[in-house]
Amino acid sequence: MKHILRIFSGYWLMFIILVGFTYAMVMANLWLPDKMSEIVNNGIIKQDMPAIWHNGLAMILVTAAGGLCSIVIGFLAARIATGMAQKLRTELFERVESFALADFNKFSTASLITRSTNDIQQIQMTSILLLRLALMAPIMAIGGLQKAIHNAPNLSWIIALAVSVLLVVIAMLFVIAVPRFKKLQTLVDKLNLVTRENLVGLKVIRAFHNEKIEQKKFQQANTELNKMNLFVNRLMMLLDPIMTLVMNFSSVAIVWFGAHLISSGNLQIGNMMAFLEYAMQVIISFLLLSMVFIMVPRAAVSVKRVGEVLDTLPSIVDPQSPQQLPHDATGKIEFKDVTFTYPDADLPVLSSINFTAEPGQTTAFIGSTGSGKSTLINLIPRFYDVSAGQILLDGVDIRQLKLEDLYDQIGYVPQKGVLFSGTIASNINYGNAKASQKLVEKSAKIAQAAEFVSELKNGYKNEIAQGGSNVSGGQRQRLSIARAIAVEPNVYIFDDSFSALDFKTDAKLRSALAKETKHKTVLIVGQRINTIMNADKIIVLDEGKIVGQGTHQELMKDCEVYQEIAASQLSEDDLQKMSATTAKGAA
């Protein structure tokens, strides 16, 4: 709630104006029945036409003024609510963007989408309702009750009875419906999760012909949400017939008992008509308040869910007193006794990691699945922070650098090439907005993307569809590599980034990349020995520990784990050739 109040404080002037127009509108509505009473008592019954014309004209003018006030109130309420929603949505997006990878684990992707769309929409709708009704209803109820008692005090018990019945019904609905609102938002999360999984895994679903199973899962989630929606909506719909019954019975009772009072000379016809109008205003006011009280708990669930995200502080932030990299920074990376454990995990993924990656050299990492290769290089751009030890960049602990300064030094290419909606050029210069067209083209050429780009109708201005769906996996990966090159960093990180390339393209790319990065620090994660065997240093990981460091020839001689990997990937002829080469090198 504190976030809502903080954002709302920026609209206090609009709110004050809205309060003024709301008060004016309610006063206009409360003034009309009295004038109607005067027309009946002093005009119609006494056949005083000037009184009829005078009061009738006044009623028309006041009605027009009230209508104008209502329009202004609607405009201001919408402006405040939509402005708050926009601000809230922006803050939520910025907070999520600042999260470290560990922070994302606290919320599912589907839940974050629901919170930034459905929940904020719920807050916006309730805000409009509150601004329009929460102010108007109490004033109308109190003013209407005073006016009603003034016109016919003997009939005021009818209003008390009608309001009591309404309050009992509303309380019952409140108790039943409110617990369902939280469940409703959870079911929306569940449906979004199933939908997202189906969209992301569509190829796998079709490949294994599991469409019916996924349809069943979706239908189950959809049915649960539908049942809950129906239950809540039916409860809300009960208010309408109950309201109609209460108003109709109240009207009948007022006319019935009012007629007896009129016949006995204790009440005038105009006063009874005014009382009837005021009674309806009071009853409607309580109905409006009940709608507010029912909607607020539902919105409160959304406020809490949005607040949970905004209250989650990023676990990785800039240091209070950041250090500067040396002016002649070269990109030297040092791991000193680094240990890392994932949040909520019992055992470390990496233990006592020590190595140095020198500028002008290529350092490669290899190991079995789950050995910690990708985790290790994800520590360098601070996707996660080390649990113990230090990672130094040119002698400075990366935790003491501003994140922006750290990212400027790194060109990162993930396992799966990621492209964004826009042009090919905008994707290549994504990490370097100041990149010239010449640099964009040079980066594409090094990444072996220039050839296929030149064949496109619009070249570098060709549009990339969402997720890069209109380019192949290899093209997507080459553009991702070009994006890293365009940053012109001191440190290049390739997380198994050549897997989608054919042998010929891979060889050309590595040759061009070697020339471009001859004075840079290059870190490569590989699954296949033939992709990393020419590296200056190969680090072998097994169960989160370094079990070997050296060149390919050295590891083939001394590292048992590396030998096992080689034996599983290479033919006997290749192994014999490598053994001969190793023996020759040793001699």
For each feature predicted by the language model, list its residue ranges.
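ABC-type nucleotide-binding domain
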Residues: 326-587
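Short intracellular "coupling" helices and adjacent cytoplasmic loop segments at the cytosolic face
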Residues: 46-47, 82, 90-114, 118-120, ...
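Helix-loop-helix
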Residues: 48, 143, 147-164, 175, ...
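Membrane-integrated ABC transporters
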Residues: 1-32, 36, 44-60, 65, ...
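An intracellular "coupling" helix at the cytosolic face of ABC transporter transmembrane type-1 domains
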Residues: 98-102, 118-131, 135, 139, ...
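Internal alpha-helical transmembrane segments of multi-pass membrane proteins, especially GPCRs
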Residues: 16, 20, 53-57, 61, ...
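Transmembrane helices of ABC transporter permease
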Residues: 10, 14-27, 38, 62, ...
